[in-house]
């Protein structure tokens, strides 16, 4: 993607499909490679785990990871790639999300719908969902929850709108000057 001119990329792996140590090492090596070759690491790293869906039973996969191992992965990604945004979805329960936010997860979703047309007004059938959502709270409930934990939720997309992507974003982020761009 970067060789084709895309200057801002995110990485991710669906944990549970393969041995997690292999996937974890691979994502860190990929981040390191992007830095070495392009001078820019990943803007984000997403850490979803395989979850139940209409035709998927996670117990049939022998590489699932428990909550404690998942939390360690999140903490180690934060240490290894401190400048990246780390994303966790509503695949995870409120309890797990609360734990990993404290370990460095910086972006979470709220009130997510995973089915085709899921955000339309009408009720959609559950058998079209990509995966079962574990945290079913409304967006307002998620925002209030974050505030009660002492966080300031933000929906900011200014960096993208202002062209602060790729090497421009990375320079601000690594020097910790990005905070001076946020008001």
What function would you assign to each model-found segment?
Residues 1-7, 14-40, 50, 57-68:
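Conserved non-cysteine loop/helix-boundary elements of the Radical SAM core domain that shape
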Residues 7-8, 85:
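Residues at the starts of beta-strands that form the adenosine-phosphate
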Residues 8-9, 153:
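Hydrophobic beta-strand scaffold residues
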Residues 36-183:
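Auxiliary Fe-S-binding modules of radical SAM enzymes
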């Amino acid at each position: 993607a970067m060789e084709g001119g895309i200057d801002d990329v995110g990485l991710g792996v669906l944990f549970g499909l393969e041995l997690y140590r292999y996937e974890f090492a691979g994502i860190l090596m990929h981040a390191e490679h992007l830095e070495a070759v392009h001078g820019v690491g990943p803007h984000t790293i997403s850490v979803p785990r395989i979850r139940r869906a209409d035709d998927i039973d996670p117990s049939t996969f022998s590489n699932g990871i428990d909550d404690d191992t998942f939390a360690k992965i999140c903490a180690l990604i934060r240490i290894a790639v401190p400048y990246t945004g780390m994303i966790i979805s509503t695949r995870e329960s409120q309890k797990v999300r609360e734990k990993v936010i404290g370990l460095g997860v910086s972006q979470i979703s709220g009130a997510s719908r995973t089915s085709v047309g899921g955000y339309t007004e009408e009720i959609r059938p559950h058998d079209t969902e990509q995966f079962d959502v574990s945290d079913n709270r409304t967006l307002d409930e998620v925002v209030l929850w974050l505030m009660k934990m002492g966080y300031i939720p933000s929906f900011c997309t200014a960096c993208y709108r202002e062209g602060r992507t790729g090497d421009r974003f990375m320079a601000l982020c690594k020097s910790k000057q990005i905070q001076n761009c946020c008001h």
